[in-house]
Amino acid sequence: MPNNKFFVKSSKASLRWLGATVLLTLYALPSWAFSIDDVAKQAQALAAKGYEAPKSNVPSQFREMKFADYQQIQFNHDKALWHDLPTPFKIEFYHQGMYFDQAVKINEVTATAVNEVKYSSDMFNFGSVNHDPDAVKDLGFAGFKILYPINQLDKNDEIVSMLGASYFRVIGKGQVYGLSARGLAIDTALASGEEFPRFREFWIERPKANDKHLVLYALLDSPRATGAYRFVIYPGRDTSVDVQSRVYLRDKVGKLGLAPLTSMFLFGPNQPAMTMNFRPALHDSDGLSIHAGNGEWIWRPLNNPRHLSVSTFQVENPRGFGLLQRGRDFFQYQDLDDRYDLRSSGWVEPRGDWGKGHVELVEIPTNDETNDNIVAFWTPEKLPDVGQPLELAYRLHFSRDEDKIHSADFAYVKQTLRSAGDVKQTNLTRQPDGTTAFQVDFVGQPLKELDQAAPVTSQISVGDNADVVENSVRFNPVTHGWRLTLRLKVKDTKQPTEMRAALVNGDKTLTETWSYLLPANE
């Protein structure tokens, strides 16, 4: 028979310990935690009701100002968010002006609360821009930038810019801004016109003193879609951003572009400038790279076509895609002001299975470098039903080290050169023969390991709009790679011409697939 006195005493002691445990647990847990679920609730509620277009309260003087005047409006560094806190991250804000004429709400998330960051004109230096202080006292911010000592410990550098629609730009150590990422793209390149969703509200978590990453959230809104986003930013030699998103459709869309990247291509060795220019190339990116679910690597050099061009690449469960700047030598650009050799490449690394769909490349004609004319994104085969969440997770990499992005198992395209084809005559002169010629240099470890006498050959395919006049491969002693020469006779110059090529050694594929589109009227 049990000792009841012992049982009672033990029970009371256990209860006392249990009470202490519960008390400790309550004190150990945070009183609350902000998450993407909080933003998703707002996005879902917005999607269930009609779209309300944002209203602008920007005075006409600011809306109509020139870029040079807008540049004069600078944020006061000593007003930065967390200026006096022991964290390497600082937040500065953009003033409204020009086409940045819609205010976004920005909040700070702390361990205990969410507080809106209030606009004040005292935060800005207006330079020589004359303005009525009363007219701007309640304007609000156009966006924000994130500062971090990425290049040297005693200097804060801008590493992220959130400004305009759902655009954001990110750079790593030693990089300069080039291409942009976006939250969402809708109906890009459709005749009905593109819809540009915008981030209307942000929540930025206050980092701890030793945090090497920054977390922020965004609420996206547009006439036919809403979305909740979580970004975790890791500054470094290659800055990376983990993105988690939930998108809700208000209405049906023709095309949904996920993880979109936007860039610029004006001219380069594969499409020389139409007018004389001291720069050999002028672009933020020179190609689209795709790592397909089946392991194939594809490289599509970019063009500045005379007419809108849309290319699709059917890929199930992509392992990655991005717009890259493969040329990293200054002499390839010769631009001391804009330093295209330092522009970052952008790479999308999916998390989880994305299923069936395609990577789409949109190339838009442009006459100058101020227009972003290149867009790349993923489109799912099946769109979500209206009101149902579409969840997507991926990591964005911003890098100047393309070798880290590409697999060492395959050689890659170093450059694509295009010219009028010719034939060497008996007197050693070259006579044009009406063909279009391509020189494609492949480099990489699989080629370096080969003897220069190795029987490397090419596998090519060309569309119905051209005949192959020459297909040859030779060792390139300068790059320690191989150069493919193709000469094509285009049948109808008013039509585009597709071609693909890869190098092989017997039955072993040595390189990525070079996939080129010769635009119409070239």
Curated annotation (Swiss-Prot):
Does Cell membrane count among this protein's keywords? no
Cited Gene3D superfamilies = 2.70.98.10, Immunoglobulins (2.60.40.10)
Signal peptide per UniProt: 1-33
Task: List the coiled-coil residues.
Answer: none
Single GO molecular-function term? carbohydrate binding
Question: What PANTHER family has UniProt attached to this entry?
Answer: GLUCANS BIOSYNTHESIS PROTEIN, GLUCANS BIOSYNTHESIS PROTEIN G
Q: Which keywords are on file for this protein?
A: Periplasm, Signal
Provide the gene name from the record: mdoG
Q: Where in the cell is it found?
A: Periplasm
Please provide, in alphabetical order, the Gene Ontology terms of the cellular component aspect for this entry. Answer: outer membrane-bounded periplasmic space
Task: Give the record's family classification.
Answer: Belongs to the OpgD/OpgG family.
**GO biological process, any:** beta-glucan biosynthetic process
Organism domain of life: Bacteria
Q: In which pathway does it act?
A: Glycan metabolism; osmoregulated periplasmic glucan (OPG) biosynthesis
Q: Which organism is it from?
A: Sodalis glossinidius (strain morsitans)
This molecule's function is given as: Involved in the biosynthesis of osmoregulated periplasmic glucans (OPGs).
Where would you say this protein principally sits, based on its record?
Answer: periplasm
One Pfam family from the record: MdoG
Q: What is this protein called?
A: Glucans biosynthesis protein G
